[in-house]
């Protein structure tokens, strides 16, 4: 378990981030070939029908901090760090790719209450949600009841694995403080108003987790999640996409619109992170169904 996440429960600038970090459980999940004593972080908070929330690339569970207060009276929220991301353990000499991410989530589902589960995925987490729902409809029909995707990344296109050396250089570049600050600002519709020390702290906190660069490089080498949206899974799907999204460019948005059709709704005054820029609209969309 990352020391940074333990400290976050009391030391984060953002009070909503502190609440979420304090709700973390450390689960043992029997992933193939890994030490059974490893502990995997997942925040569990609220009461009601279970709802699983999946964060994006090079992020952590803490990105859902503003959405949690709006949903926790209606749902028991399960918010994991995806395998190889956030504050998860990162054993050496291991492949980090989509298959491991899905294996980890399938084991997590076995720990969740029985019955239908809702699923919200943001950015890359949207593609993870689609793949997980499609997988579960074959293994356990009805387990995933519906999906809400927030600016989903990777539904279209094709995998583009980075070769050795370039993957490590890319990870090192993403670790630079100035680069992280720039990406954090780029993710919001109005960074001058929305981004300050609290946002920058959470966007970079997990970089201190041991093995961060190695795992990120190996995930990039795998090609990650790309072109995974067709066919879409059977459960109902809604999609929110920020009108001011500057992370996913126009061609990606157009391809997603062709795939998703009327399921996709544009959100004004919103960048790449609807759950941070417009959490009330995200919660309203989910609770209205």
Segments from the language model and where they lie:
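Conserved catalytic-core motifs of eukaryotic protein kinase domains, centered on the activation segment
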Residues: 63-65, 88-94, 158-161, 250-251
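Active-site loop/oxyanion-hole signature of alpha/beta-hydrolase fold enzymes
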Residues: 18, 25, 31-36, 40-45, ...
């Amino acid at each position: 378990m990352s020391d940074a996440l333990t400290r976050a429960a009391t030391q984060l600038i953002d009070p909503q981030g502190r609440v979420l970090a304090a709700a973390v459980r450390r689960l043992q999940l029997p992933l193939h070939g890994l030490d059974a004593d490893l502990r995997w972080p997942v925040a569990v908070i609220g009461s009601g029908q279970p709802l699983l929330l999946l964060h994006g690339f090079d992020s952590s569970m803490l990105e859902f901090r503003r959405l949690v207060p709006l949903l926790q009276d209606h749902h028991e929220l399960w918010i994991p760090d995806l395998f190889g991301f956030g504050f998860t353990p990162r054993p050496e000499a291991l492949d980090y790719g989509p298959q491991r991410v899905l294996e980890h989530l399938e084991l997590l589902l076995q720990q969740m209450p029985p019955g239908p589960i809702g699923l919200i995925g943001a950015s890359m987490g949207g593609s993870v949600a689609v793949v997980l729902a499609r997988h579960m409809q074959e293994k356990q029909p009805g387990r995933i009841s519906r999906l809400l995707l927030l600016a989903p990344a990777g539904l279209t296109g094709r995998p583009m694995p980075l070769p050795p050396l370039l993957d490590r250089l890319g990870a090192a570049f993403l670790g630079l403080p100035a680069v992280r600050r720039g990406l954090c600002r780029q993710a919001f519709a109005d960074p001058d108003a929305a981004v300050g020390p609290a946002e920058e702290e959470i966007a970079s906190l997990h970089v201190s987790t041991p093995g961060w660069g190695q795992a990120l490089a190996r995930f990039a080498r795998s090609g990650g999640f790309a072109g995974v949206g067709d066919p879409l899974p059977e459960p109902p799907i809604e999609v929110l996409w920020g009108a001011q999204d500057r992370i996913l460019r126009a061609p990606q948005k157009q391809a997603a619109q062709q795939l998703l059709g009327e399921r996709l709704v544009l959100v004004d005054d919103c960048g790449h992170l609807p759950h941070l820029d417009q959490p009330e609209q995200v919660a309203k969309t989910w609770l209205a169904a």
